[in-house]
Regions:
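Short alpha-helical hairpin
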Residues: 30-48
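An active-site-proximal "capping" alpha-helix that borders the catalytic cofactor pocket
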Residues: 107-122
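His-Asp-centered metal-binding catalytic motifs of divalent-metal-dependent phosphohydrolases/nucleases
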Residues: 84-102, 108, 112, 134-143
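Divalent metal-dependent phosphate-bond-processing catalytic cores, especially two-metal-ion Mg2+/Mn2+ enzymes
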Residues: 8-19, 54-60, 64-79, 125, ...
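Acidic/histidine metal-binding catalytic segments
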Residues: 80-84, 124-136
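N-terminal twin-arginine translocation
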Residues: 1-5, 15-31
């Protein structure tokens, strides 16, 4: 399902919206806070514990908001998907920015996805569902790709992006959005600095990605790979 299709379903809603089925208390018509809800599955509970144990507050809040925005998108479009996969992939999509899951070799999205998939497998998810968790986390910042993967991946990327840059929220109940976004103020600066910290020992992974401008601004000596020049300089280009 492409993001265009998802957005096409995102008309304004009346009344409250139910949170994802992973949460208790669905009899209430109000969207419940992730931080105070109790997930129904062992994996969902473990994912919440892992997030809380490893992540600073600004990332915990961002991941909670992203899950709740995903629930709005799902409810608005009456979208059928694997709620547990969506929940775990979105909740853990930034683990790679934490000290525990930092990798000196791969992008933080991949480190996050690896950790999320490992947790999913440890709690009994099938290889296919765990691979989908990996996609949700790894591809969350690649809208042009995630749109054409699973529905869970498309919804997750859409929700996470809405929290980071604030687009596409005017189609939802403004009171619900205001409650979800109460913790959003002051997120951007520590988020950017977390990316900078993660890139210090692997600045090259930012080249030709959405992190390029951050690396160029904050990391001395960062050099953006020029794919055009490298392709033209390939010795096989002019044998």
């Amino acid at each position: 399902m492409s993001r265009r299709e998802l957005l096409g379903h995102g008309a304004a809603m009346t009344g409250g919206l139910l949170a994802l089925g992973l949460f208790a208390g669905q009899a209430s018509a109000a969207v419940r806070s992730v931080s105070t809800s109790t997930p129904r599955t062992r994996l969902a509970k473990a994912a919440e514990r892992l997030l809380q144990e490893t992540s600073p507050d600004f990332l915990v809040d961002h991941c909670h908001r992203s899950v709740e925005l995903a629930s709005l998108i799902v409810a608005a479009g009456n979208i059928a998907l694997d709620e547990e996969v969506l929940f775990v992939g979105v909740l853990l999509h930034d683990l790679g920015l934490t000290q525990r899951f930092h990798s000196s070799e791969v992008r933080f999205e991949v480190a996050s996805a690896n950790a999320a998939r490992d947790l999913a497998l440890d709690y009994g998810l099938s290889a296919a569902r765990a691979a989908n968790v990996w996609d949700v986390a790894a591809l969350h910042a690649t809208g042009g790709i995630s749109d054409f993967k699973s529905t869970e991946t498309a919804v997750g990327s859409d929700a996470i992006g809405r929290d980071v840059v604030g687009y596409g929220l005017d189609g939802f109940d403004p009171d619900v959005v205001a409650r979800i976004m109460e913790t959003r103020a002051g997120f951007a600066e520590p988020f950017v600095q977390a990316i900078v910290a993660d890139l210090q020992d692997k600045p090259q992974v930012a080249s030709s990605t959405w992190m390029t401008t951050i690396a160029a601004k904050y990391i001395p000596g960062f050099h953006q790979n020029d794919i055009e020049q490298r392709a033209l300089a390939d010795p096989w280009e002019n044998p």
